[in-house]
């Protein structure tokens, strides 16, 4: 049976994986660091205890980067502002990760929205 502690742990893991993904995406896109190097040196990524959490972060970040043009086009179509005017800049990365989960990954809609809001 699932108890409150289990639910809390699952929620914490979901939020943590998204925070680590955001940090990695920010470092790669805004600081022009190589993706493999960022994975190897990211304290947040290294600290993830579960291999499935590390795999999820890798999948989300690599898919976001691979599909960046498509994701940015979807955001541009849905936003009143040009992507370059979305502030703070990390908000654009949060939107990118959310769109990636909704469109390109098998993440349930409620989970993607809940974890990215």
Whereabouts are the PLM-identified features?
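Class I Rossmann-like S-adenosyl-L-methionine
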Residues: 1-117
């Amino acid at each position: 049976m699932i108890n409150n502690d289990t639910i809390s742990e699952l929620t914490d893991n979901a939020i943590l994986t998204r925070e680590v993904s955001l940090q990695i995406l920010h470092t790669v896109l805004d600081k022009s660091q190589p993706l493999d190097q960022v994975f190897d040196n990211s304290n947040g990524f290294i600290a993830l205890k579960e291999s499935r959490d590390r795999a999820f972060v890798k999948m989300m970040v690599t898919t976001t980067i691979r599909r960046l043009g498509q994701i940015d086009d979807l955001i541009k179509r849905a936003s009143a502002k040009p992507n370059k005017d979305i502030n703070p800049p990390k908000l654009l990365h949060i939107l990118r990760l959310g769109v990636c989960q909704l469109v390109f990954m098998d993440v349930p809609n409620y989970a993607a929205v809940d974890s990215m809001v």
